């Protein structure tokens, strides 16, 4: 092999170090702690603000929580958004939407053997006004397709939320998809 033990990007510069020791010459920067957004907590904390809004996308992440955390399925502003969360107190998951400031919340029971405090995979597929919700790689229990959950023409961005300030998120992926709202096959 090539015996490379460090490959790092610092800003837009790639650094590749070979086998190193305490006296090896070269640039050896100290690693930094990972950060998310870096903008501090606001009403929209956890929203992916630096990405392109869309009406068709896939957003998925792992979430480890004791309850009170989940994903923001759609965010335009504080009065126009949708949350998919896990609720340990009621052993359920929910879809909470605000459209024009009007709130709607639907809750669905989780299986009896659902474990809290371990990673669960949440996947949101948005196509226009339709949201499809997947939990641990299968359709969310109770209901997983919400045909008119959000306004079809209102672009937005996804994100994560944590009401308990103790949840962990891993491997968030945001992929803008083909907007087929106006096409019928």
Q: What are these model-predicted stretches?
A:
Residues 1-185:
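Extracellular glycan-recognition regions
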């Amino acid at each position: 092999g090539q015996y490379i033990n460090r490959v790092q990007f610092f800003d837009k510069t790639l650094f590749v170090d070979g086998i190193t020791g305490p006296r090896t010459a070269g640039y050896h920067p100290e690693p930094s702690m990972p950060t998310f957004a870096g903008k501090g907590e606001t009403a929209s904390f956890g929203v992916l603000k630096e990405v392109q809004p869309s009406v068709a996308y896939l957003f998925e992440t792992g979430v480890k929580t004791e309850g009170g955390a989940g994903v923001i399925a759609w965010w335009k502003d504080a009065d126009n958004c949708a949350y998919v969360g896990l609720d340990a107190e009621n052993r359920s998951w929910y879809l909470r939407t605000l459209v024009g400031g009007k709130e709607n919340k639907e809750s669905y029971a989780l299986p009896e053997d659902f474990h809290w405090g371990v990673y669960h995979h949440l996947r949101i597929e948005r196509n226009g006004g339709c949201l499809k919700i997947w939990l641990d790689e299968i359709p969310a229990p109770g209901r997983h397709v919400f045909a008119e959950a959000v306004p079809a023409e209102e672009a937005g961005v996804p994100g994560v939320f944590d009401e308990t300030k103790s949840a962990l998120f891993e491997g968030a992926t945001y992929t803008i998809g083909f907007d087929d709202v106006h096409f019928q096959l």
